[in-house]
Amino acid sequence: MGAINVTPDSFSDGDRFFQTENAIKQGELLASEGADLLDVGGESTRPFSDPVPLEEELRRVIPVVSELAKRTPIPISIDTCKAEVARAALDVGATIINDISGLRFDPQMVELAAAANVPLVLMHMQGTPRSMQVEPHYGSLFSEIIAFLEERIQFACAGGVSRERIIVDPGIGFGKTVNHNLLLIKHLDALATLGLPILLGTSRKSFIGEVLDKEVTEREPGTWATVCAGIIQGAHIIRAHEVATCRQLADMTDAIMNA
């Protein structure tokens, strides 16, 4: 999953892809490098970030989704917590909803996901982007995350979403300490009890920088290590900002595991 941040304040890309044409070109590049799908988002969810107004988020992402749906043959995911943004993106060619709130922030999202009958990513997050990194803590890390995801799955299904359409994401970096993130990757297979595909997003995140003492622009090798470990532990989808190397890493890791 190639990530495209159409924001002026992405923790990873800054404002490199804030301009519509730059974001479209990046999507085409990621597709050419071997991405199986693209994930377009217009609201930064870095720690302590504020929500983006609806009209601004629409202005950022809809032209990008629309053009990429025409120019690339791969599925496009809309990364949003707002039902109106998701609906508009689906109308112009998106075929996946990636809701980092796990359907918690917009009560209309579950109805939309059910009616659209498209794949839906449900992510774990402790708190909100603004508060999630204020002393995150757990009594039992895996028990609490699995219980959260199962409750969100049940909520989605009660709202009409088919369970077989759901993908789960443990939310690396969303309300977790460095050690929480490392443990989640190390024991990612614990989420297999949910019986659903697992999406893992570690690309360039701050825990890598803290372990390696590297700035965001120097975190690709650390990202690659997490990709390999995640695949070995059962990740089905890897969300990445740099696809070319991750594509090779994923394919080689799969080949070794399936030999």
Short names for language-model regions:
Residues 162-165:
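Short acidic capping loops at alpha-helix termini that bridge into adjacent secondary structure
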Residues 25-41, 234:
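Catalytic domains of carbohydrate-active enzymes, especially glycoside hydrolases
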Residues 1:
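Glycine-rich phosphate/adenosyl-contacting loop at the front of the ribokinase-like
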Residues 11-26, 45-75, 80-84, 90-91, ...:
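Active-site-adjacent loop and "lid" segments of alpha/beta metabolic enzymes
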